[in-house]
């Protein structure tokens, strides 16, 4: 265990010596050194004439957990170290001392890694810059110096051909892993020999039993005077006796069995020889397969190396393309720089010209400032006047809208007054006819449904609300028209201002002497342009708000019109159903209905004329048609609904009576009793219709 501790101390001191070299690759522990990158960098630093940059590029840096690439890197390093010792140092190293790359790559074996570090230390001590590395070693701690000197002594013993020291890492007696493997193999062999010994003991016991049996048989044959199995004395064996003949037969049978056993033994020998030949052939094949697997592993390593080379080639191609693009961009930038330099030269010339002109016009600055102040005052006055004019125009437009609304209301009131007068006249004329039919009408008025009246009143209220909304909509449309007109005026002013700017710019190139005046006019025009554009933006925002309001009102109006149309259709359907019911129930009421059709038609025409007169000024053609269709319910409709209700009640009562009679005349009655039962009554209107 002391020797193992010494070996580990030497190994750790060699790793600490590697840290002095200041390598870029990680080299703190066994895993970092197992890929061989740090060791290759150390060799490149120690002997660059042998381990050049091209040789270092062959070492794969991005290895990861691929042990095959690690093995290939370590083999290259070990081969390079051996070549360095042979060619440059003229020292022949034994193949027994070659570090095992497989153990370092797979298991991170510290013993094999220590051998490799010893060889690298020998390269550093015997290279061209050995004085530098020796001084670095001398600057280390004393314990590290002792361990490194012990490692160097072991290498010198190898060079001189002497046996290595006890402290050497190369001593096979210190290989703990090999000793453990030998111990395991010996234990396995002991176990196998114990098994064989037990089998042999069993065979020995079986053979002893057979020998005892044979001895008993021999004793029987040697002593013929013995008593047989049946208890009789056998007597002596003589030629020609029956016993002799029996024994002779037994001997012949035994000889035959012996011959058969010998033939079977020969056959088994032949078979065993054949099987041994087959086993030898199979062993040869197994050896060939092992060699083939080794070749396959080498080919896999080469394939991995080629794959990495291919990946690097692709990366290089992409980098090359990017560099080409960058070169093209660089050429374009050069051209742009030339253009910019030319422009900068032109700008410098222009600046010098402008500075000269500014010196000329320096005396006119005072006058220009006075003119600016006057222009600002005039602009303020103009803005105030424009605001006043806008307010007056807006108030004027509002008053005009109110006046037009009042005139429309006046016209509506006049038309309603005329319609009411006509209705009063018609009511006076038709009062006599109504007195004659008072009996019928009183009944219908009493039974008139309140739901229908409430519905009619609600529809009239909605119609009025729509008319008022239409009036507000007209006012909004007028405001929108005014805003559009203002917007058009501002656009015309903006166009004129732009034309003025163009004229001023042309005059500026022609008249250099009046440049200051033209600049002032240009600034004024630009300020006017900005003010007009701001006014246009405000007008456009107001116009957008008005348009949104108009769209909302139009959508509400469309929804109301749809509701009114649906109510009209429902009302017409109800009237048609009532007429059909009256026709089917009582044909005599048809003539009365025909007589009563004329006055409601007149009332409907009057209502349509009155409402049409009111809607002609406020609503469009579509709203006028819908309002004329929504006339109030006439007398005929009320009477029809009442009669239909009474007829329906009578039919329901008759059906109830018939059902009760049918229940009374059940299936248990006789034929005569059923004949005596009264027949169900039939409605008179049906018989009358048949006639």
UniProtKB/Swiss-Prot annotation:
Top-level taxon in the UniProt lineage: Eukaryota
Report the residue ranges that make up the Calponin-homology (CH) domain in this protein: 8-124
Listed GO molecular functions?
dynein light intermediate chain binding; microtubule binding
| Chain residue ranges for the region called Disordered | 431-454, 595-633, 667-691
Give the matching SUPFAM superfamilies.
Answer: Hook domain (SSF116907), Troponin coil-coiled subunits (SSF90250)
Residue ranges, compositional bias (Basic and acidic residues)? 443-454
What cellular component GO annotations does this protein have? centrosome; endosome; microtubule
Q: Which residues form a coiled coil?
A: 136-568
Q: Name one Pfam family in it.
A: HOOK
* Broad class of where this protein is predominantly found: cytoplasm
A Gene Ontology biological process noted in the UniProt record is: endocytosis
Localization annotation: Cytoplasm, Cytoskeleton; Endosome
Where is this chain compositionally biased, Polar residues type? 667-676
User: In which residue ranges is the amino acid composition biased (Low complexity)?
Assistant: 616-629
UniProt keyword list: Coiled coil, Cytoplasm, Cytoskeleton, Endocytosis, Endosome, Microtubule
What is the annotated role of this protein in its UniProt record? Involved in endocytic trafficking. Probably acts as a cytoskeletal linker protein that tethers endosome vesicles to the cytoskeleton.
Tell me its family: Belongs to the hook family.
Q: How does it assemble?
A: Homodimer. Interacts with microtubules via its N-terminus.
How are the domains described in the entry? The coiled coil domain mediates homodimerization.
Q: Which PANTHER family match?
A: HOOK PROTEINS, PROTEIN HOOK
Protein name per its UniProtKB record: Protein hook
Q: Which organism does this record belong to?
A: Culex quinquefasciatus
